[in-house]
Regions:
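The feature primarily captures lumenal catalytic ectodomains
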Residues: 1-260
């Protein structure tokens, strides 16, 4: 619950009151409030990592869930106004990116839907999945991945920090262009990662809606949410065990491993 307390303190500093009170345990009053004013928030971007068919995506969400869909933009709106809207949303939809840290302001029981561009494996980039599933957050996480290369728009001539690869050797450029899955790497200057994460995406609406439908089937009700969930660290990698005999009567055993991915 520490993160929720932190979010609450930040909101108080910004003079923000939560739009929809979904914090309480289950009950008919809460259900009535949700039905009256539920809405979905979609993060809109105007420079990079665009959702090319954003309007179509918004319409699909509205039709599927029969509730209002609003967009927010950190490029065009103040941070407090964005937080105000997110704090009352039942779902937050966004391309992978730092703006998803605002999911910590979502009310309990809300869903986080993270979109990933082509060749970017959701299983390898899990900070926001981890945040959503921390004890006390009580958020439902769903990811969608673009698997159709024809639905992506790349920008090889941009500056390297925005995914450009024109500065690389021809052999390396060709390898990146031919790759269908970004290999594991350390954040955040890997050129293949930057090239792929800064793509624009034409979201395949049928597959997106199907992923949402399947994902929402496993969404627990507020009555079933418990704050006793467990957090599992990432798999232990490159474990090493060393022994050091100092004297006939004294020895040391040292175990080390790589920092976990999450």
């Amino acid at each position: 619950d520490e993160i929720r307390q932190f979010a609450k303190a930040l909101m108080e500093k910004m003079n923000i009151t939560r739009g929809e009170e979904m914090e309480k345990d289950g009950g008919s009053a809460e259900d009535d409030k949700e039905k009256k004013a539920e809405y979905i928030v979609v993060f809109s971007r105007s420079a990079t990592r665009l959702i090319v068919n954003e309007a179509e995506l918004i319409m699909a969400l509205a039709q599927e869930f029969q509730i209002r869909v609003v967009t927010v933009s950190l490029e065009e709106q103040s941070f407090p106004s964005v937080v105000q809207l997110i704090s009352g949303a039942s779902m937050l939809v966004s391309m992978h990116g730092a703006q998803l840290i605002t999911s910590l302001f979502l009310p309990r029981g809300a869903a986080v839907v993270e979109l990933f561009p082509f060749a970017v494996n959701p299983e390898q980039y899990t900070p926001y999945k981890t945040l959503a599933t921390l004890p006390g957050m009580d958020l439902h996480y769903i990811s969608w991945r673009n698997t159709k290369e024809e639905n992506t728009i790349t920008h090889p001539d941009r500056p390297w920090e925005q995914g450009g690869i024109a500065h690389l050797e021809k052999e390396e450029r060709e390898r990146i262009l031919a790759s269908k899955d970004v290999p594991r790497h350390l954040c955040c200057r890997n050129p293949e990662w930057l090239y792929r994460i800064y793509q624009d995406t034409l979201v395949d609406i049928p597959s997106f809606v199907e992923v949402l439908k399947e994902g929402m089937k496993t969404k627990p009700s507020m009555k079933k949410l418990k704050s006793t969930s467990t957090v599992h660290p990432g798999r232990v990698r490159e474990a090493q065990c060393q022994t050091l005999v100092q004297t006939p009567n004294e020895a040391k055993l040292t175990v080390s491993w790589q920092i976990p991915w999450n």
